Amino acid sequence: MSRIHNDPKVLLTGTTTVGVVTKEGVVLATDRRVTAGYYIAHRKGRKIWKIDNHAAATMSGAVADVQMILNELTHLAMNYRITHQAPVPIKTLANYASVVMFYSRPMIYIAHMIIGGVDNEEGPVLYAVDWYGSFTREERFMSTGSGSPTAFGVLEDGYRDDMSLDDAVKLATRAVRAAMLHDPGSGEGVDVITITKEAGYREVQA
């Protein structure tokens, strides 16, 4: 276990995930390539996880670790909806993931997630949660994974505060595709979803 703590390279993930928030809703986009080091383990990996009709998350890190945490969030969302007759706040999901990851120390989960959605408290919102349990609200956009440096450049250049949801879809797709051109850990196509108050979770053609 000390090797994981002492060598940051072990924590690098071969993927690109992007989240963009607009006044209309949120957009999540990812590539499809699943890697294990320099080995391409899968070419059609699904890296967007539907938590509820109003919430979803991107997956970056060790697949089993991320899946375990997102299963927990899915159960939390279901139980919250049954108990309160309302959708769980996105901040509650991010905070719960943060607590799970923080208290797993020293055996940390290798997971980095963008959790996004639309709720009654904050409207369209994005949170990022890393493997140490830190979580932050992202006011405009976020990217994780080995392709994120390239994706951030595209996002910084193209984001506008007044952009439409359709433009955000195009921007997120462009950011992931740019990362795929420069990052060997990313590739095989782009998956995109949107979440709005009116339509909820919806898969979009990239």
Swiss-Prot record:
List of catalytic residues: 15 (nucleophile)
Record carries keyword Plastid: no
Notes on how activity is controlled: The formation of the proteasomal ATPase PAN-20S proteasome complex, via the docking of the C-termini of PAN into the intersubunit pockets in the alpha-rings, triggers opening of the gate for substrate entry. Interconversion between the open-gate and close-gate conformations leads to a dynamic regulation of the 20S proteasome proteolysis activity.
Keyword Protease: yes
EC numbers: 3.4.25.1
Primary localisation category: cytoplasm
Biological processes, Gene Ontology terms: proteasomal protein catabolic process
Intrachain disulfide bonds: none
Record localization: Cytoplasm
Any GO CC annotation of this UniProt entry: cytoplasm
Record field: catalytic activity: Cleavage of peptide bonds with very broad specificity
Summary of the function given for this chain in its UniProt record: Component of the proteasome core, a large protease complex with broad specificity involved in protein degradation.
Family that this chain belongs to: Belongs to the peptidase T1B family.
PANTHER family named among the record's database cross-references: ATP-DEPENDENT PROTEASE SUBUNIT HSLV (PTHR32194:SF0), METALLOPROTEASE TLDD (PTHR32194)
Official protein name in the record: Proteasome subunit beta 1
Organism of origin: Caldivirga maquilingensis (strain ATCC 700844 / DSM 13496 / JCM 10307 / IC-167)
Lineage start: Archaea, Thermoproteota, Thermoprotei, Thermoproteales, Thermoproteaceae
